[in-house]
């Protein structure tokens, strides 16, 4: 082995505003606002900017001014910087701009289009679902019960080639999605769902947009191996959720996942997070959710 000291003259860093905002159709806008730092800077100098002016524009018309909330219960990248919250409901199909002004920095803004959903879920067939169990590790002799087996439903409607679609299924009284798998071509043919050369159970299944109308019956296998969670009530309904992500959100979350996978890997390639902010750094993106609940 050999050792060598390499000295590099890094250029001076001009701090810029950073914006982290992921809009959701039907919800109010929230944004985390801070400032950039030199890569070798002291993280103790990282601070919130509660006096910033954060304005939401819809189709180039100002519709909301977000108010700073000092929410210390939620950390952003391990820093407590609070969040700016609005009261205007975000709508599908609209173009939104989040603009930030703060006296010490250049004005920064980012734009995105909030997606809508054109896919319908119908003809849900639960007849092939079974009840299984596993030992309750917290109570000797007790068992946790859950549903498994095939769930079928029809998905129909025009897909948008600029959007990304994620399916998940939960019990009405549970937060964690069930593990599931599908060999349907629109699922199994997606590289996103493939790991180590095969399709494995996942808590969400991905299919991408295209220019054709979707009209197929999906067969989903719920909890094909087992379950980590028991259901509080195995007689209540299931929630089939379709999350529709615009490309800004999809690309950011994909790169963020790559970053999380690379954090403790010294041989991993550097991950560059997407940036669509003019005059600063960060991301403004949007998504929508559609839910269908079984009886």
Predicted features and spans:
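A sequence/structural signal for flexible, mid-protein segments enriched
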Residues: 3-295
């Amino acid at each position: 082995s050999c050792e060598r000291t390499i000295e590099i003259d890094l250029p001076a860093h001009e701090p810029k505003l950073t914006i982290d905002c992921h809009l959701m159709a039907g919800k109010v806008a929230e944004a985390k606002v801070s400032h950039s730092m030199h890569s070798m800077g002291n993280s103790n100098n990282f601070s919130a900017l509660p006096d910033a002016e954060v304005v939401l524009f819809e189709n180039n018309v100002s519709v909301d001014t977000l108010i700073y909330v000092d929410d210390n219960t939620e950390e952003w990248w391990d820093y407590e910087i609070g969040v700016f919250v609005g009261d205007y409901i975000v709508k599908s199909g609209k173009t939104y701009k989040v603009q930030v002004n703060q006296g010490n920095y250049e004005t920064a803004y980012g734009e995105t289009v909030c997606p809508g959903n054109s896919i319908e879920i119908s003809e849900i067939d639960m007849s092939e679902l079974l009840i299984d169990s596993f030992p309750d590790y917290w109570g000797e002799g007790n068992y946790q019960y859950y549903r498994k087996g095939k769930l079928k439903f029809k998905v129909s409607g025009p897909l948008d080639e600029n959007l990304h679609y994620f399916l998940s299924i939960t019990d009405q009284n549970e937060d964690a999605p069930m593990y599931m798998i599908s060999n349907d071509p629109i699922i199994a043919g997606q590289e996103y769902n493939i790991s180590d050369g095969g399709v494995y159970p996942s808590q969400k299944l991905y299919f991408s947009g295209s220019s054709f109308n979707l009209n197929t019956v999906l067969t989903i296998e719920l909890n094909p191996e087992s379950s980590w969670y028991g259901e509080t009530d195995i007689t209540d309904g299931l929630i089939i959720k379709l999350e529709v992500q615009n490309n800004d959100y999809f690309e950011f979350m994909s790169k963020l996942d790559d970053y999380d996978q690379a954090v403790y890997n010294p041989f991993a390639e550097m991950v560059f997070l997407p940036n669509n902010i003019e005059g600063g750094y960060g991301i403004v993106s949007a998504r929508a959710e559609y839910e269908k609940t079984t009886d």
